[in-house]
């Protein structure tokens, strides 16, 4: 029986869950999100946010999509916009990798770079400034607060993990950018499947531990880091902290070294945020009470998107 997709945005999901054999004790399973159509977990939200905008009549051929991005969401939006014939403007910190910039342009997006010192806040501010000058011309997708973001993980990623493990998982680990991935998956497993004993662990950069600071009642003090795609420097509205059980901080160096180890030992090309999530899993598994637990780790993107970064600097 043949199956033909009507456009590339419809091909998201059904990414493989793979057991690690030489990292950890055999109980770490990684979900390889680079198998999505534009090679990252963000393909899911890129598609769903645009689908929702279509359903709600927010966009047409005369309205230009706009979004602030650190790269992967922008690439996801660009491939969906191209496949469904929409125009797209993206604002992005200049510090993001050259691979991301070139891919965005190749997919037809207009790319506006912002001062890297201000991170994602600067990119968001620039997008809002552009809209304020001509609000009828643009539709802002707002990945950090758009409910279509966690929704797609609740209806696709969560069920995929549940079905592939037959519900036999104890710990979920995901690095946090917008918060949509960990929120959507956790909602599905804890609320729909009622596995309330799932331990859901968020990962953030130790150089910019804003979630940790917030939960401790401290002032939020973001800082620069090298784990592209996570640690935006604020608490995203799409991050539901009421269902997150633990937050682990990982340094940029730890994330990079672990991503390298994953490539060499397991043959899995992975980005820096994947290294951060896996590092957290390794540390958790080293604790006696978690040594026999089944751990699922989200690997957001592939290594090729970081060829110009420190991930490949020694080659």
From Swiss-Prot:
Biological or metabolic pathway of the protein: Amino-acid biosynthesis; L-cysteine biosynthesis; L-cysteine from L-serine: step 2/2
Cofactor(s) essential for the protein: pyridoxal 5'-phosphate
Question: Which residues does the record list as N6-(pyridoxal phosphate)lysine (modified residue)?
Answer: 42
* Reactions catalysed, as given in the entry: O-acetyl-L-serine + hydrogen sulfide = L-cysteine + acetate
Q: What is its EC number?
A: 2.5.1.47
Positions with a binding annotation for hydrogen sulfide? 8, 35, 269
For this protein, the record's PROSITE patterns field holds: CYS_SYNTHASE
Entry superkingdom:
Bacteria
Q: Kindly list the positions annotated as binding pyridoxal 5'-phosphate.
A: 72, 177-181, 273
Q: Which BP terms in the Gene Ontology apply to this protein?
A: cysteine biosynthetic process from serine
The Gene Ontology terms for molecular function here are: cysteine synthase activity
Q: Which UniProt keywords apply?
A: Allosteric enzyme, Amino-acid biosynthesis, Cysteine biosynthesis, Pyridoxal phosphate, Transferase
Q: Which InterPro entries match?
A: Cys_synth, Cys_Synth/Cystath_Beta-Synth, CysK, P-phosphate_BS, TrpB-like_PALP, TrpB-like_PALP_sf
Q: Oligomeric state and partners?
A: Homodimer.
Family assignment from sequence similarity: Belongs to the cysteine synthase/cystathionine beta-synthase family.
Q: What is the protein named? A: Cysteine synthase
What is the name of the gene encoding this protein? cysK
């Amino acid at each position: 029986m043949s199956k033909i997709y009507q456009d590339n945005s419809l091909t998201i999901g059904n990414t493989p869950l793979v057991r690690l054999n030489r990292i950890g004790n055999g109980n770490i399973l990684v979900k390889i999100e680079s198998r999505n159509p534009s090679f990252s977990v963000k393909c899911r939200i890129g598609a769903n946010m645009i689908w929702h905008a279509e359903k709600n009549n927010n966009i047409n051929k005369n309205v230009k999509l706009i979004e602030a991005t650190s790269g992967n969401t922008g690439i996801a939006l660009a491939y969906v916009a191209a496949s469904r014939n929409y125009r797209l403007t993206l604002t992005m910190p200049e510090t993001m990798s050259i691979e991301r910039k070139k891919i965005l342009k190749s997919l037809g997006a207009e790319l506006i770079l912002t001062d890297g010192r201000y991170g994602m806040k600067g990119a968001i501010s620039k997008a809002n400034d552009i809209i304020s000058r001509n609000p009828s011309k643009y539709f802002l997708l707002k990945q950090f607060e758009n409910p279509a973001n966690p929704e797609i993980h609740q209806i696709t990623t969560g069920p995929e993990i549940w079905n592939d493990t037959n519900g036999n998982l104890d710990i979920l680990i995901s690095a946090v950018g917008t918060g949509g991935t960990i929120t959507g998956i956790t909602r599905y497993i804890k609320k729909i499947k009622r596995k309330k004993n799932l331990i859901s662990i968020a990962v953030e950069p130790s150089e910019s531990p804003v979630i940790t600071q917030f939960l401790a009642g401290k002032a939020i003090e973001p800082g620069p880091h090298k784990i592209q795609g996570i640690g935006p420097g604020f608490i995203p509205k799409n991050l539901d902290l009421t269902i997150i059980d633990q937050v682990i901080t990982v340094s940029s160096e730890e994330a990079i070294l672990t991503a390298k180890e994953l490539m060499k030992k397991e043959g899995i090309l992975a980005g820096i945020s994947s290294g951060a999530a896996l590092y957290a899993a390794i540390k958790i598994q080293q604790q006696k009470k978690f040594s026999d637990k089944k751990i699922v780790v989200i690997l957001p993107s592939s290594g090729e998107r970081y060829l110009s970064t420190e991930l490949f600097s020694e080659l």
